[in-house]
Amino acid sequence: MMNVESLERVEKSRFGSHFTKPLYGDYCFSNIPETIKKLLGAESSRSLPESILKGLPQKYDKIVLFYIDAFGWKSMEQHQETHPLLRRFEKEGMISKITSQFPSTTAPHVVSIHSGCPVGESGIYEWYMYDPKLDSIISPLLFNFAGSEERNTLQNAGFQPGDLFPHRSLYKELKTENITSFVYQSRDY
């Protein structure tokens, strides 16, 4: 089923011909981690609206999150009729449209999904950013100085991940609630 409420909310957040204001208070990517916590029975400070699972259970023993970078709403619409998994989601579940954070780039969203912090709290805004402590342009996700092919050059320079990334972690927060979690990803990341 398609969540019509989400379509209407996101449509109302549009301005100009090309822009959508992030709906940080409800239908926004940044609310996915807290929604996962809530659905697993953990304390949650903010989450996506209950309408994202309208007609479905509001609590689960297990949740699988597939994070597919750059697979936005336009991609979903393009493949919805031809991809069996997307057809199954619509038939047996609920498809909701949500807004991206700003900026709508990979780096802030990767950090957000793992930390539970919206981009404004995480401080990671782009693939490359200037860090005043190092007085250098860095690539936070690769944890290196911009232009370097080598990984972890920031650590080699005495900079630690805690100096850059949020101290919060979705997985640590789930663990404090006695909820086991796993992340499967390429070891290169």
Where are these regions (language model features)?
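Short, low-complexity intrinsically disordered segments
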Residues: 51, 71, 122-125
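Short secondary-structure boundary micro-motifs
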Residues: 48-49, 69, 95-96
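His/Asp/Glu-rich, glycine-adjacent segments
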Residues: 1-45, 79-95, 99-189
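Beta-strand elements within well-structured catalytic alpha/beta cores of enzymes
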Residues: 61-73, 113
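Short coil/turn segments at beta-strand junctions that form active-site/ligand-binding loops
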Residues: 59-62, 179
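A short acidic-Thr-Gly-centered motif at the start of a beta-strand
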Residues: 48-60
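ATP/Mg2+-dependent ligation/transfer catalytic cores
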Residues: 58-59, 73-75, 82-83
